[in-house]
Amino acid sequence: MDTEMSVNMSDFLHDQATRAPESLQQSYILMEDLYERKLWKQLTDALIVFFDTPETVPLRLPLYTNFVNSFRPNINQLKAVYMGLKAFESCSNDEALRNLNQIVNELDEEKYKDAYVYSIVAIARIKLISGKLDEARELLVKASKIIDHIDYVESLIHSSYYSVSADYYKAKADYAQYYRHCLLYLSCIDLDKCSHTELVERAVDLSVAAILGDIYNFGELLLHPVFELLVGTQHEWLHDLVIAMNVGDLPLFERLMGQINKMPLLQSSVALLGQKIRLMALIELVFQLPPNQRTLTFDTIARATRIPSNEVELLIMRALSVGLITGVIDEVTQIVTISSVQSRILNHSQIASMESRLREWNQNIKNLSNVVEISGKGVFV
């Protein structure tokens, strides 16, 4: 029986090789050799290389269906599912969904948790593409619970989960969650293997999410290599807008209003953006002051944030409510005393400013030390 199966598989591989470009024919010879010797790990590795080759797209489905499936129980199940997903790229969404459901039904969830969760995340992606957001969400929640109970999670699984989750939150216009999951996705993948176009699209989406979401610390985005890919493109103004938002740069924000109004998503939220950048301007104002000089008048804040004095208290209360600052407002004297500012990742100019303040503080300590030394001479003699 094994000999007959081997002969049949040999004929199949020879037939497939004749349909393949000359550059790929050697791969089929290698597959046949490894299959006949039952070197499953080496065969799996060779197949992964084959399935990862862009030119093999039309050749993958018959190879997976007729060849890989014949020995699938003998190989790593996560890699088997990976090859299946690569093969289904040439299928319609409905056909891919049927194939994936069959894989899920055949997998032992407890024994092969990694392969199982990878499969249901792939199903969630198709549900999402088909507009079935609730079904996609249910699968993602289920996947998250399984991932939490896997001792070691392959980056392949994490990247897939975060990618689909990010797309889900984008579809739901949940900007803060999209921002978080997209950054997690990017941390799981090799950026060098992504196309420039894909990374620029991610940078655009991340920038919009950072601007519109309930996000007040832009450090992770500013320091991420994809963010700089916006420079030199038609989206460079978004790069500048994020920088303006980060430091509360109102003049730059106002110069970018023409571009903002060209993007409907931002144009419809201009009032929100105005409030957010004024919050950041307030934070920047406080940050620039020494901790012992953070008592501000409403008029000072009004000038820095370019709002009427009678709107300052509302701005401060908003900053307090979202945790950007802690402090006490004196409504009678129209003064606010700031006790702390939310920690943040600093840009180069902010680091330079902090260095200057540290030098000033160090000098003050030296001066105080000299005063104590001179004043105490008579006491310690």
UniProtKB/Swiss-Prot annotation:
Transmembrane segments: none annotated. One of its GO terms (molecular function) is structural molecule activity. InterPro entries: PCI_dom, PSD13_N, PSMD13, Rpn9_C, WH_DNA-bd_sf. Pfam families: PCI, PSD13_N, Rpn9_C. Coiled coil: none annotated. One of its GO terms (cellular component) is proteasome regulatory particle, lid subcomplex. Keywords: Proteasome. GO terms for biological process: proteasome-mediated ubiquitin-dependent protein catabolic process; ubiquitin-dependent protein catabolic process. Residues 177-343 form the PCI domain. The keyword Protein biosynthesis does not apply. Acts as a regulatory subunit of the 26S proteasome which is involved in the ATP-dependent degradation of ubiquitinated proteins. Belongs to the proteasome subunit S11 family. This is Probable 26S proteasome regulatory subunit rpn9. The gene is rpn9.
